[in-house]
């Protein structure tokens, strides 16, 4: 049905956007290396922690998309996305604190901020994918459509 096709179009768009953000983050890593910029040990750990959270979200979203998980799984995805949002705000504050204490360069700070913002957007798109699948499936149930 048209609603299901529309949902799948949105899923494809969100997958493409995840790829765009991944490419942007990779470009930032190259730029960091070219500029000779390094992150503090704390910043590196924070990035690794946030990356792990986002990777878990992507994996769970894929499992939901493949329908390896039931609809109740969405609560877990919403909770994870809220934790990623909170983590981004927390890391932005840590970044500002390091800049204020001159523990990092403005270049490192800018790249750090851009990377964590990109990761947060990836988490948003991962949640969108599951949300569109849920709505598509619920529309199919309501209309009796076959997928």
Regions found by a protein language model. Give the residues of each.
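Cytosolic, long alpha-helical scaffolding segments
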Residues: 1-147
């Amino acid at each position: 049905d048209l609603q299901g096709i529309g949902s799948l179009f949105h899923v494809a768009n969100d997958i493409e956007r995840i790829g765009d953000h991944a490419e942007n983050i990779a470009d930032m890593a190259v730029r960091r290396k070219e500029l000779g910029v390094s992150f503090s040990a704390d910043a590196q750990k924070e990035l690794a922690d946030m990356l792990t959270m986002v990777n878990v979200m992507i994996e769970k979203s894929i499992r939901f998309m493949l329908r390896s998980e039931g609809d109740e799984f969405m609560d877990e995805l919403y909770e994870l996305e809220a934790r990623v949002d909170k983590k981004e705000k927390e890391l932005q504050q840590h970044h500002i604190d390091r800049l204020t204490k001159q523990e990092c360069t403005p270049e490192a700070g800018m790249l750090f901020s851009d990377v964590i913002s990109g990761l947060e957007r990836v988490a948003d798109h991962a949640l969108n994918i599951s949300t569109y699948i849920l709505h598509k499936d619920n529309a199919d149930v309501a209309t009796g459509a076959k997928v």
